[in-house]
Amino acid sequence: MDTKTQSLPNTHAQPHSNSRPQSHACHHCSCSQHCQSRSRSRSCRSRSSSRRPRSHRSPTGRQGQSPGPSPPLRRHRHTMHSHQCPSRPVTHSCSHSKNRKNLEGKVIKRKQVKRSKQVYKRKRQSSGRKYN
């Protein structure tokens, strides 16, 4: 390959100016570097991806069968939840704010009822003490 690439710029150098074959040769170098870097990154990615399942498999094998299946389920739930989240919050927040208002009103009413009962009991007790 090296002999061919060296002969090509020489043939180009005779009819054309010297600048073109040099840039062409440089372009070739950059391409080869890109290819090498890409192949390296791919190999790194493939290595890391091959390492990941091994690391996940080994702890589950050591711990036993019961903890093994549970983490993937949790992850699946997380992914499902994250997919559903973007559509939910708008409707959920609206309904939740309405529910909050209603609940606050109900809670206030309940408190008022409790207070009135307590006051009534106190009055009865105080009146009962007076009579006794």
From Swiss-Prot:
Q: Which key words are in the record?
A: Chromosome, Developmental protein, Differentiation, DNA-binding, Metal-binding, Nucleosome core, Nucleus, Phosphoprotein, Spermatogenesis, Zinc
The GO cellular component terms are: nucleolus; nucleosome
Summed up, the tissue specificity of this protein is: Testis.
Biased composition, Polar residues: where in the chain?
Answer: 1-20, 82-94
Superkingdom is Eukaryota
Residues that hold Zn(2+) according to the record: H12, H16, H24, C29, C31, C35
Composition bias type Basic residues, residue spans: 37-59, 108-132
**Which family, according to UniProt?**
Belongs to the nuclear transition protein 2 family.
Q: What is this protein called?
A: Nuclear transition protein 2
